[in-house]
Every structure is written in structure tokens, then in C-alpha cells.
A protein has these predicted regions:
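Conserved catalytic cores of phosphodiester-cleaving nucleases, focusing on short active-site segments
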Residues: 124, 141-169
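Metal-dependent nuclease catalytic regions and adjoining charged, substrate-binding loops involved
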Residues: 170, 174-177, 182-265
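Hydrophobic/aromatic-lined pockets within catalytic cores
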Residues: 57-61, 158-161, 188, 235, ...
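Secondary-structure boundary elements
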Residues: 113-118, 147-153, 188-195
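Short acidic (Asp/Glu) and glycine-rich catalytic loops that position anionic groups and cofactors
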Residues: 33-35, 160-163, 204-209
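Short histidine-centered catalytic/ligand-binding loop motif
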Residues: 41-42, 85-92, 164-174, 216-218
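Metal-dependent nuclease catalytic cores that hydrolyze phosphodiester bonds in DNA/RNA
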Residues: 1-140, 247-248, 252
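Coil-to-beta-strand transition motifs
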Residues: 136-140, 147-151, 194, 205-208
Length: 265
């Protein structure tokens, strides 16, 4: 079993490994090989806020988030940022720190989220690596949380709309179904029990409503097939060093079915 726990591998070290991860698969499945090949990993205000909420929920005992000055400008921020980076911690402005705390508190007030995140069996931010035996491609994954005995994978999502309809749209837009299928596939290659994948979704705006969702068995089967087909595309692109879009030179945009009645007039 190829497992490297977070204590043994930092997030930066994980991302430096050249194996294919879930973000790569999501990009290819939802956009193209060209988008994946040309993408640059970015860090931003929103990225830091999301990382802080993850750290507060999954590893609160490590106190990985630092409350910084009012703004990101000036000497005070620069000095604290250098110190935080050295310590492997996340520096936030005063407002963002308070926002992350509010989101964390709201999330933990959700009964299901609290039950999952306070489980003593929770393994947070562990890295897993495997080689797919059929495609011969190196894979990696770093799930937010894993309840090993229960066979449950947890994924924290900070979002604009945690309602059933809103999150359903987000699943389609951002490829969360492919992400879930990929995580489950790599974990199973590592002989890890995986029976379910649960998204813990917390809204960014007050009152930070939180909801938990799972994908249906049919949805996961469909996502698994799509994910495996995407891995084949990635492997072929790597072997041939060809990363195109597969888009036509001249495409035709057709009238959506829901607009047919309008066109009749």
C-alpha cells in the first residue's frame, strides 16, 4: 500500500510530484488537454481563504492559520507572510481570518458535518500514489479526509450556493463527480476501503449555511467511466506529446431545446 501521510509530505511536496491528480483530470474532462497542459497553479485571496477553512476544520489542533494585519499591503504583511511560509502556515487579513472562523463555526454547527469531522478515525490530508495497471499511468490523490473504518471519503467545499439545486449545478460545472470517482479509484488501487464519498459544503456568505451531499450510485458509475476515458486521453497525450482541444476549426452553435418554442414565433 503506497500511503504517505501529511506529516511525511507537505502540500507543496505533493503538488511537486509529477503523477496525475484530480485537478488535472477535472480540467481535461471539463475543458481540454490544452487547458491542462498550459495551466499554471495559482494562489489567491480566495485560495488562501479556502485553505484556511480546510485547515481549521480538518486539523484545528495544528493552529495552521494566522490572523494578520488589516491589509495585504505594507511591511507588516510581507514580514508575517515570510514567517508563515517558513512555518508552513496560512496568513490571512483580519477580515478573512474572522470570515474563516465564522465559516468553520457554522460548518461545525451542522449535525452531519460535525459527526464526520470529529470522528476520531479521521485521517486528514494524507497523500496516496498508485499506478493504474490497465492504463499504465502514475496517479496521486490527497483527500481532505478519510474515515478508514467506515470507508468514507470527505471533501470540503466552500461555495456560493449550498442548496441541493445549487450544488447540483456546481457538480456539473466544476467536475466534482469526476473528482469523486478519481479519489475513489486511486484509494481502491491502494487497497483502501471506500464505500462512500461525501461533500461537506459551506457557503461563503453569512450565515454560511452548510449541507452535506453524496452522489447516487448511478452518478458515480457514470463519473467513473468518464474519468477512466479521460485517463486514457491523458496517457495518449503524454505518449505522443500532443495536447490539443479536439475542437473543430469552425463550430456550429445550435439552438437549445428549451428555446424551440420561442423560435416558432
Amino acid at each position: 500500500m503506497t500511503i504517505i501521510k501529511s506529516e511525511d509530505m507537505s502540500n507543496e511536496e505533493y503538488h511537486a510530484r509529477r503523477a496525475v491528480g484530480s485537478s488535472s483530470v477535472k480540467t481535461v474532462a471539463s475543458k481540454s488537454l490544452a487547458h491542462w497542459k498550459g495551466q499554471v497553479r495559482k494562489e489567491s485571496h480566495a485560495f488562501d481563504l479556502g485553505s484556511a477553512v480546510h485547515a481549521m476544520l480538518l486539523e484545528p489542533e495544528k493552529q495552521l492559520v494566522i490572523r494578520g494585519p488589516e491589509t495585504r499591503r505594507g511591511k507588516a504583511w510581507t514580514e508575517l507572510k515570510d514567517e508563515a511560509d517558513t512555518l508552513g502556515k496560512i496568513l490571512l487579513t483580519e477580515a478573512d481570518y474572522d470570515l474563516a472562523n465564522s465559516m468553520t463555526d457554522a460548518c461545525m454547527n451542522n449535525n452531519m458535518a460535525n459527526h464526520l469531522l470529529t470522528n476520531p478515525d479521521l485521517l486528514a490530508e494524507a497523500s496516496f500514489f498508485a499506478t493504474d495497471p490497465d492504463i499504465d499511468i502514475e496517479l496521486k490523490t490527497r483527500p481532505d479526509g478519510l474515515l478508514r473504518e467506515a470507508g468514507i471519503v470527505l471533501d470540503i467545499k466552500t461555495c456560493q450556493d449550498a442548496s441541493p439545486r445549487g450544488f447540483e449545478r456546481a457538480v456539473r460545472t466544476f467536475g466534482y463527480d469526476v473528482q469523486a470517482a478519481f479519489y475513489m479509484h486511486v484509494l481502491r488501487l491502494n487497497k483502501v476501503r471506500v464505500d462512500n464519498f461525501i461533500f461537506v459544503c459551506c457557503e461563503k456568505d453569512s450565515p454560511h449555511v452548510t449541507a452535506c451531499y453524496e452522489l447516487s450510485e448511478m452518478y458515480l458509475r457514470h463519473a467513473h467511466n468518464r474519468m477512466m476515458a479521460t485517463l486514457v486521453d491523458i496517457k495518449q497525450a503524454q505518449d505522443n506529446d500532443e495536447y490539443g482541444t479536439n475542437w473543430p476549426d469552425l463550430g456550429t452553435i445550435h439552438l437549445p431545446a428549451w428555446m424551440d418554442s420561442e423560435a416558432a414565433f
